[in-house]
């Protein structure tokens, strides 16, 4: 399928080509690769429980230029980072590579080889304006970009669907990158646009897209990097699905989507004694938030933005009170402080919520357009220049195109 890149993407691809030729020399032919960042619009920690999510690809992306090198290795040079090589004759995961881009390349190579692709050497020059560690899924974007590059450059395999690419990327994130995650991040990156996702069947997640930009309804989608990489709280993040799934296991199930809330309510006292209160609170959040996702999707379909805003605030409160992925132990509370300060500017208008995994990363704010300049300036004063940015939904998912 032919892809048309917008002016912003084309400019970033041109930078990637310059970097390619600086690092590797000129090539006979170039492959352009694009993978957007993403924003979780609704559904905080619902995906790993087989629940529902609304997510949107954003107008920030990882863009890369690739070409075969006939050297038997994959060479990657990202602007601002040290270059590295991956020997694709060794595709085993290793803890020494956890949380590294090298692990992502190795993991995606392993997944494509399993599909029947024949690996070969290539060079990849990367430019990104997706903030790393800020909750916009920079790792998922890199996974999807690497996967689309290998799909186009390697022989022997068949076309990879967006869902399959997302599942391969999730495997890479979990097994090679060493970070637990649901499927939402990767599927949003691979699909593009604004999409409702149903993860009840993990083998065949369902997705429905909607052509919508929040600016058309009077709101700016803003994300605030709170200045704390959520990688620092990987253990806290990992505890969320573990505790939710302990509740499910008490009913002989693997995920909360398989447990009727009425069955849970009938056994609260017993479950408190066996699992502790926090696991129950997180389960309560799942059912409440999943219902809010469905209601917010209906609101967006019906252009009822004010109801969407009201329910988004309810979602944010649930994350803080029940899911408990905003505050961390001790006096260092960057995400909660960001939410409180954002509320102090909005004064009851718009909506604020924790964004993505939580425990740092970023917060999400729907800001009335009349306030957006003031809001961004004030949040940047508190959290640093560039911490608060106004984003738009991008319809382009992860793709590759020969130039």
Give the residues covered by each predicted segment.
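Glycine-rich phosphate-binding loop
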Residues: 359
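Structural signature of FAD isoalloxazine-binding scaffolds in flavoprotein oxidoreductases
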Residues: 52-70, 191
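C-terminal nucleotide
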Residues: 1-38, 63-98, 196-352, 365-403
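Gly/Ser-rich oxyanion-binding loop with an adjacent helix/lid
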Residues: 1-31, 36-52, 88-92, 97-216, ...
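FabD-like malonyl-/acyl-CoA
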Residues: 140-141, 362-367
């Amino acid at each position: 399928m032919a892809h048309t890149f917008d002016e912003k993407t084309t400019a970033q691809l041109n930078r990637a080509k310059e970097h390619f030729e600086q690092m590797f020399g000129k090539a006979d032919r170039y492959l352009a690769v694009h993978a957007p960042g993403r924003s979780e619009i609704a559904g905080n920690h619902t995906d790993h429980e087989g629940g529902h999510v609304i997510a949107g690809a954003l107008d920030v992306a990882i863009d890369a230029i690739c070409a075969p090198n006939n050297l038997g290795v994959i060479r990657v040079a990202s602007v601002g980072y040290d270059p590295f090589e991956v020997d694709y004759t060794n595709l085993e995961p290793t803890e020494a590579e956890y949380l590294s881009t090298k692990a992502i390349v190795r993991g995606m190579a392993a997944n494509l080889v399993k599909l029947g692709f024949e690996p070969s050497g290539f060079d990849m020059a990367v430019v990104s304006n997706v903030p790393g560690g800020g909750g916009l899924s920079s790792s998922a974007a890199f996974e999807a970009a690497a996967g689309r590059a290998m799909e186009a450059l390697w022989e022997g395999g068949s076309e990879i669907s967006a869902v399959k690419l997302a599942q391969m990327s999730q495997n890479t994130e979990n097994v090679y990158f060493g970070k637990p995650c649901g499927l939402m991040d990767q599927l949003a990156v691979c699909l593009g646009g604004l999409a409702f996702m149903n993860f009840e069947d993990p083998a065949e997640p369902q997705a429905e897209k909607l052509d919508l930009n929040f600016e058309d309804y009077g709101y700016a989608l803003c994300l605030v990097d709170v200045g704390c990489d959520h990688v620092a709280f990987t253990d806290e993040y990992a505890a969320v699905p573990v505790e939710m799934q302990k509740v499910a296991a008490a009913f002989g199930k693997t995920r909360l989507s398989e447990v009727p809330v009425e069955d849970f309510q009938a056994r609260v006292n017993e479950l408190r004694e066996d699992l502790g209160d926090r696991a129950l609170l997180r389960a309560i959040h799942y059912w409440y938030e999943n219902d809010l996702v469905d209601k917010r999707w209906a609101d967006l379909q019906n252009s009822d933005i004010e109801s969407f805003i009201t329910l988004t605030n309810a979602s944010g409160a649930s994350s803080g009170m029940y899911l408990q992925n905003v505050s961390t132990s001790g006096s260092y509370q960057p995400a909660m402080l960001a939410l409180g300060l954002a509320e102090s500017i909005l004064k009851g208008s718009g909506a604020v919520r924790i964004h993505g995994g939580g425990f740092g990363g970023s917060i999400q704010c729907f800001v009335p357009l009349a306030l957006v300049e003031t809001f961004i300036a004030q949040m940047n004063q508190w959290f640093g220049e560039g911490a608060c940015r106004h984003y738009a939904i991008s319809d382009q998912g992860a793709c590759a195109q020969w130039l």
